Structures are given as structure tokens and as C-alpha cells.
């Protein structure tokens, strides 16, 4: 065949990683192939995809100098000004195939921009053949599959790419602009890039690109680019494109790839060590009314020895708190008192003055701290007072001693106990932070309600440690709600322990690790980090998933009812949903960070002529993509500047609530069998997190050690004051601060060094930012606190307290 005579090669096309120009929907791509402006062929339209594979053949009449131009368009926007342009390539036929010798060539080319400089992305794969034999469609399919994990981008507005029309594939992800500045510049295209963990370097030569991806074509889920995974391990990706590994031997998941010299014994030992750390942390969690005076603010020794009250009429508000500390009784009993002994030989004391009895020796003086804020803002003890001088207890109250001789009080009217002496002014007065007054009082009220009282009898639950999920499901689901309200008695198969609280704590610890494990596809990790959880919208892969969600709801209710804690933490929106509160755009940050940025941009900018949106969203479930109307006929209703707020609200509700509504309703049906909805609604979402998970003992030294500073030095006065304030706070206030800055009160098992952000490990950071007249601001996705340069310790403490105590909800960005 002469080079000057036209030849008739065949053409097949596929593309991968097209640019998603619309924020909320996928394009309907088709290709137009043109030779010399005369021969034009158009492919069919592939609906809603960034990786179309047409597998259509066209006959072309070309010579060596012919230019083949292939353009990709979005059929949805073909009538718009830019015709939905998605990229173009131009190929000189003589450069890629020898028309005289014939042959079959597979080419991979990067899509290029047009003269309009619209951002494009992705690759076009072409099969050119000069014979009539059928091309190797398997090869084309393999190449198509090999690009599935290529970098993808999403954007809001057509922009000029800063350097090239596509990002280079590399081993590390490009830096997200929001990572350093959460206040996203509206002129910048919000994007996220999730390359595979070991992507091959991009090559200018199409053949090189083709080969590099072809080498990964046959990788199964049991291997990756580093080789075969150990026996029983599988590689998976979550909904955010993050790779994690499943160990089917132990039914656990991890973000860390198992090493090639995998040692099962060493791995098991490490898991057991981590489990012990988590167990100790879990068992140390508590709530305000469970903690002793040791967790109260410490007073100077000199002030504790003060015995003389101040002059009357002091302007300082004085509050009182019983420490429960006692001293040994010596000498004679006070007038009117008598000591007697029960038949069991236990001494008790009769006060004939008030005709009351008590276990407490009136000679054993109970110290009453009376402290208030003086002129310089420090706490000062006013006096100590013996219990015997306080008079009788109110009707229905009883004083008792713990086995460590610490006094506590029983209110038989409400069947509750407290450390606070009812004869003293409430320790929860104006000197205590508002949130603490509210939470503790809510807790006392909540637990005093008849629906939360343990019924007579026992509820026996027998489980095997190595099969705790299935055994617990069978045991808890076979019993009625009223049976579950009886005293809980846990027994582990093959163990002789009696449950006086320790076994039930161990039970809830182990069970929460199992039932929230992403291995079972019921829950998945959030966009915030890899330890807060959200409901998996694809949990329907298990046909019994709704029964399991009802079971999990029962377990959460059971833990609250029996005053136990679960070692699990959810996104803020989940707690809001439990309280039947309306979710907001801020809650989206923990579910889908990119969508949160895009919706925020939509609200803050003019979208007329920029975004072609309707009141509908595209959703993919088990490979099937469908359009969902956000309101009746939504796919035909355009989004404008006037109705975009409603659109954002509906998208937020669909993404957070509607997608998992079926699962969540099953969860709540089980939960409300033990905890009535009207009772749990007394809490807010942050208090509900503490009610379910308890309050952790936070190691401030570890926190400080793994903190970064921007604009500050560790030696700066404001930083020194910050850590002094944190150390002076009790465990509950520290947990509140942790919630405020990271979105959860959970601490990773290995401490703050393993703190996670939305894009992987992210250390706690204090940044110099803001006006000293303003409050500190947190960025929960990045574990960052914007701290203005306050001039004094008092100002910093005041501003921090207001920010932490009065701010509601997660995602303060």
C-alpha cells in the first residue's frame, strides 16, 4: 500500500478518568472522531460515568499525513456554549502506524484542552488496526480496568489549570489547598486526588503509559503492587477511596499493609497489647456523678487549712462542695449521741437530738470545702464543718459509706445516689460552668426516671469470647425488652467469674469492637478520621442488616440503661439524628468533606451560568447508578441563586439522613425499646456522646508532646498559659476541649501521636490566628485550634471556656 494512497484502518475508543465538571452529577460522555475535517464518526452516549468504554468500530480513509482528531463531550451539556467539552487529542496517523506494513496499535493519550482553556482530565485509549480482523477486546478491557484507580478530580467552576491539563500520577497525593487554609478561596477549584498507593510515574509516551498500567491489570484483591498479601488477607477500598486490609483469620481490619515477613504470632501479640491498652482506657471512662473529689479542682494547701469564714457581706459568690474526706473519731461522743451495734456487729450511731441514726461516727469530721473566687480569680477555702452540725437529712434520704469509708447519699424517693450532701447548698451553682451544671443535673434527672429503673430479677447472657457478636445477637434478640431491664448478669463460656460489674464492662468493650467493625459492612469509618463511625449506606449487602441494626440499637440502649460504656464513637450527625434534631451543612464535614466544600461554595457564590444543577442527585448502589429526586419532579427543576439554599439543605438531608434512613430507623427501634425517646432528648449531641462512651482520662503531657505550632513557639506566653489552663481543668472539661477541637472525645489507643484527620494522620495544631477580641476557633477536620494572641492568662481562660462550653455542635469551621 503506497503512502500516498488512502488506507482504511479500524478505530475503537475508550476513555478513563474524565473531568467531573458538575459537582453533583456524572457526565454522559460521547466521542466525535474526525479525519481532515471531512470524515466524522460519533459514538453512542454512555450514561453517567467518568470511564466510558464504547467498543465501537469505525472505518477511516487516511494516509500518513492525515490528522485524526477525537473530541469528548458531555451529551447533557452539548447545547451549552462549551458543548460540555471534556477533552481532545490529535494524532498524525503516520506517527503511530505503518500503513504499508499494516498492524494493530493500542495507544494511550492524555486528553488536552481546547482553545477555551477549560480544565480537562483523563486519558483516551485508542485501538487502530489496518486489517479487518477483530481487535483484542480483552486487551482493551484490561487497559480500561487498569485505569479505574487513576487520579480523579472534581471541581465547581471551569478554570485554567495551573500547569498542565492533568495532575501527574505519583506515589503521594497532591496537597489539598484546604489543608493549610480551611477558608477555601472561591477562585480555586476545590478538588481531591486519591491516587493508588503506588501509582506508576506518568510517561509522555503512550506505550509506556499503557505498559505501566497493563502491569496492574490482573491484580486481584489478594495482592497489590508490592506483591501477594499474606494468607487470609484481602485488600479493599472504602467509599472515600482509602485502601484498607482485611484479616479474615481474625476478622479484623487495619489501614496498615501486612509486611511481607508477616509473623502471625508477633501480629497477634501486638493486637493483644493494643487491646489491653484500649481495655484499660475504656474501663477508666466515667461520668460526672461517678467521679470523686479527687477530680475536682485542686486547692492550694495553705487555703485548705483556713478555718475562719470571711466577713459577712462579701461580694464573692461562695459555693460549697463536700470532698467526702474524713478523720478518725476520737474522744467522747457529742451530747445526745449514742453508739450501738447491729446483730452483725457493725457499729452505728444514734442522734437522740434529732431521733436519727447514721453509720458515720460524729467524731469523724467530714471536711466541707467552701470556696469561691476572690479578687485575683483563684479558688480559696473558707471553712471546714463537721457532719454532725449539719442537722438531719431530708425525708427519704440516707447516708452510707463505701468500702473505702467515703460518704455518699441515697435518695429513696428517686432511687438515686449522689456524693453531694443534700443539706449543703448545691455545689452546682454559678461558680460551676453552665454546661457542667446542665449535664450533671440532666444525668441525675435522666437516671431517676421510672423507665430507667432496674426491674426485679436477673437477665442472664452467656457468650463465647471468640464468637461474641453472633452469641450476643442470639441472646439479646431472644429476650424481651422488659427482661433486658433486669439486672444484667454476663457469663463468658468456660469462665467461672461472677458479674459484679467487671464482666459486663468487659462484655460491652468486646462487643463494641466486634459489631462496629467495618468487616461486617454495617458501619464504616467517617471522612473525619479512621476511628469515628457512620452507618454504611451499602449495608444491604447483608440481607439481614436491618435485624442487626435493631440488635445494635438494643445494645446501645442496654449499655446506657445499665450504666456501662461502649468503646465506639460516631460522627456528630449520628448523635443529632438520635435526638431527632435537624442536620445542618456543618454536619456534612464529617460525612463528605469535598461535598461540604462544594455546597459551601455554592451558597457563597453566584452560580447562574456556572453550575447546571437540578433538584436531583446521582447515587450508585451495587454498580447501578440512578437519579434520585430531592423533591417531586426535582430532576426538571433548575437550581438558581434564589433556591440554592433549599437545594443545599435537601442535599445535606439526603446525604446524611435519607441514604441510611432504613438502617437508622431499625437502630432506633431497638434503642427505644430500652431508652424512651422523650428521656434521651434532654441531652444535646455532645452530651449524648459522653453518655454512650464516657469521659476519658486525658494525658496532657502526651497531648502537649504531640502538638505542632504555627505562628507560635512552645515558649510563648500564650502557649504556656494554654497548657496551664488545660492542666487545671478536670477530665470532663478536657473531654469538651477535645470534642471542640477534633470533633470527638475519643483518644487513639496509642495516644495523641496517632491522632487522625480527614486526610490521614494529623497532629493537633495550635495556630496563631484571629483577633484577641474574638473567641478561639476550631477546624475539626484538621485537628487545629486557631488561637488569637491573648494578652493575659485570665482572658485566655475566659475565652476558651466560652468557646468550649457554649458552642454547640461539631465542625466549627
UniProtKB/Swiss-Prot annotation:
Region Disordered, annotated ranges: 131-235, 251-351
Swiss-Prot/TrEMBL catalytic activity: S-ubiquitinyl-[E2 ubiquitin-conjugating enzyme]-L-cysteine + [acceptor protein]-L-lysine = [E2 ubiquitin-conjugating enzyme]-L-cysteine + N(6)-ubiquitinyl-[acceptor protein]-L-lysine
SUPFAM superfamilies associated with the record: C2 domain (Calcium/lipid-binding domain, CaLB), Hect, E3 ligase catalytic domain, WW domain
Protein name: Probable E3 ubiquitin-protein ligase hulA
Subunit structure: Interacts with creD.
Organism of provenance: Aspergillus fumigatus (strain ATCC MYA-4609 / CBS 101355 / FGSC A1100 / Af293)
Residue spans of biased composition, Low complexity class: 188-215, 322-331
Gene3D superfamilies according to UniProt: 2.20.70.10, C2 domain, Hect, E3 ligase catalytic domain, Hect, E3 ligase catalytic domains
Amino acid at each position: 500500500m503506497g503512502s500516498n494512497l488512502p488506507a482504511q484502518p479500524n478505530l475503537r475508543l475508550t476513555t478513563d478518568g474524565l473531568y467531573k465538571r458538575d459537582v453533583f452529577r456524572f457526565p454522559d460522555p460521547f466521542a466525535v472522531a474526525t479525519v481532515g475535517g471531512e470524515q466524522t464518526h460519533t459514538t453512542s452516549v454512555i450514561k453517567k460515568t467518568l470511564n466510558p468504554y464504547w467498543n465501537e468500530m469505525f472505518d477511516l480513509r487516511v494516509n500518513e499525513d492525515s490528522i485524526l482528531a477525537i473530541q469528548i463531550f458531555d451529551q447533557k451539556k452539548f447545547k451549552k456554549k462549551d458543548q460540555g467539552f471534556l477533552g481532545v487529542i490529535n494524532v498524525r496517523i503516520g506517527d503511530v502506524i505503518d500503513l504499508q506494513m499494516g498492524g494493530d496499535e493500542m495507544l494511550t493519550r492524555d486528553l488536552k484542552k481546547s482553545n477555551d482553556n477549560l480544565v480537562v482530565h483523563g486519558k483516551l485509549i485508542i485501538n487502530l488496526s489496518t486489517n479487518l480482523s477483530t481487535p483484542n477486546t480483552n486487551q482493551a478491557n484490561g487497559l480500561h480496568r487498569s485505569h479505574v484507580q487513576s487520579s480523579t478530580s472534581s471541581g465547581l467552576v471551569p478554570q485554567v489549570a495551573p500547569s498542565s491539563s492533568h495532575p501527574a500520577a505519583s506515589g503521594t497525593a497532591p496537597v489539598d489547598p484546604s489543608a493549610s487554609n480551611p477558608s477555601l478561596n472561591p477562585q480555586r477549584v476545590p478538588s481531591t486526588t486519591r491516587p493508588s498507593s503506588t501509582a506508576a510515574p506518568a510517561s509522555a509516551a503512550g506505550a509506556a503509559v499503557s505498559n505501566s498500567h497493563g502491569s496492574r491489570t490482573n491484580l486481584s484483591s489478594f495482592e497489590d503492587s508490592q506483591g501477594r498479601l499474606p494468607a487470609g488477607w484481602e485488600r479493599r477500598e472504602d467509599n472515600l477511596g482509602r485502601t484498607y486490609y482485611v484479616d479474615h483469620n481474625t476478622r479484623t481490619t487495619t489501614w496498615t499493609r501486612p509486611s511481607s515477613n508477616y509473623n502471625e504470632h508477633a501480629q497477634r501479640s501486638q493486637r493483644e497489647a493494643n487491646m489491653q491498652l484500649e481495655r484499660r482506657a475504656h474501663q477508666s471512662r466515667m461520668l460526672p456523678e461517678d467521679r470523686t473529689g479527687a477530680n475536682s479542682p485542686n486547692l492550694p494547701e495553705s487555703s485548705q487549712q483556713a478555718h475562719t469564714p470571711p466577713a459577712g457581706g462579701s461580694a464573692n459568690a461562695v459555693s460549697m462542695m463536700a470532698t467526702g474526706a474524713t478523720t478518725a473519731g476520737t474522744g467522747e461522743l457529742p451530747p445526745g449521741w449514742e453508739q450501738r451495734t447491729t446483730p452483725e456487729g457493725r457499729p452505728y450511731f444514734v442522734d437522740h437530738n434529732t431521733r436519727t441514726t447514721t453509720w458515720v461516727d460524729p467524731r469523724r469530721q467530714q471536711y466541707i470545702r467552701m470556696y469561691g473566687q476572690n479578687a485575683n480569680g483563684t479558688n480559696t477555702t473558707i471553712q471546714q464543718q463537721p457532719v454532725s452540725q449539719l442537722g438531719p437529712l431530708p425525708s427519704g434520704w440516707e447516708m452510707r459509706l463505701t468500702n473505702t469509708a467515703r460518704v455518699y447519699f441515697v435518695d429513696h424517693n428517686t432511687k438515686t445516689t449522689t456524693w453531694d450532701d443534700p443539706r449543703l447548698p448545691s455545689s452546682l451553682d454559678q461558680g460551676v460552668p453552665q454546661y457542667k451544671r446542665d449535664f450533671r443535673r440532666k444525668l441525675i434527672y435522666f437516671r431517676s426516671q421510672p423507665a430507667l429503673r432496674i426491674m426485679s430479677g436477673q437477665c442472664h447472657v452467656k457468650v463465647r469470647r471468640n464468637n461474641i457478636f453472633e452469641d450476643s445477637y442470639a441472646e439479646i434478640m431472644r429476650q424481651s425488652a422488659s427482661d433486658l431491664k433486669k439486672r444484667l448478669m454476663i457469663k463468658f463460656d468456660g469462665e467461672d467469674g461472677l458479674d459484679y460489674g467487671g464482666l459486663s464492662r468487659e462484655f460491652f468493650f468486646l462487643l463494641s469492637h466486634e459489631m462496629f467493625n467495618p468487616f461486617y459492612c454495617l458501619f464504616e469509618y467517617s471522612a473525619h478520621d479512621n476511628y469515628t463511625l457512620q452507618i454504611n449506606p451499602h449495608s444491604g449487602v447483608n440481607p439481614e442488616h436491618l435485624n442487626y441494626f435493631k440488635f445494635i440499637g438494643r445494645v446501645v440502649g442496654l449499655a446506657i440503661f445499665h450504666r456501662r460504656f461502649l468503646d465506639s464513637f460516631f460522627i456528630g450527625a449520628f448523635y443529632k439524628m438520635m435526638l431527632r434534631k435537624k442536620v445542618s451543612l456543618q454536619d456534612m464535614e464529617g460525612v463528605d468533606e469535598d461535598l461540604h466544600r462544594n455546597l459551601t461554595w455554592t451558597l457563597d457564590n453566584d452560580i447562574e451560568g456556572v453550575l447546571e444543577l437540578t433538584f436531583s442527585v446521582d447515587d450508585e448502589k451495587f454498580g447501578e447508578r440512578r437519579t434520585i429526586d430531592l423533591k417531586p419532579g426535582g430532576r426538571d427543576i433548575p437550581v438558581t441563586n434564589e433556591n440554592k439554599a433549599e437545594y443545599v439543605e435537601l442535599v445535606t438531608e439526603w446525604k446524611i439522613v435519607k441514604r441510611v434512613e432504613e438502617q437508622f430507623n431499625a437502630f432506633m427501634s431497638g434503642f427505644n425499646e430500652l431508652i424512651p425517646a422523650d428521656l434521651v432528648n434532654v441531652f444535646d449531641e455532645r452530651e449524648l456522646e459522653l453518655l454512650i462512651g464516657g469521659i476519658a482520662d486525658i494525658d496532657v503531657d502526651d497531648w502537649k508532646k504531640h502538638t505542632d505550632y504555627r505562628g507560635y513557639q512552645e515558649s510563648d506566653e500564650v502557649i504556656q498559659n494554654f497548657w496551664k489552663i488545660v492542666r487545671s481543668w478536670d477530665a470532663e472539661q478536657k473531654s469538651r476541649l477535645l470534642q471542640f477541637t477534633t470533633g470527638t472525645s475519643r483518644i487513639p489507643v496509642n495516644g495523641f501521636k496517632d491522632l487522625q484527620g480527614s486526610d490521614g494522620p494529623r497532629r493537633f495544631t495550635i495556630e496563631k490566628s484571629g483577633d484577641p477580641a474574638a473567641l478561639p476557633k476550631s477546624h475539626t477536620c484538621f485537628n487545629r485550634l486557631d488561637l488569637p494572641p491573648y494578652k493575659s492568662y485570665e482572658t485566655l481562660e475566659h475565652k476558651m471556656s466560652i468557646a468550649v462550653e457554649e458552642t454547640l455542635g461539631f465542625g466549627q469551621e
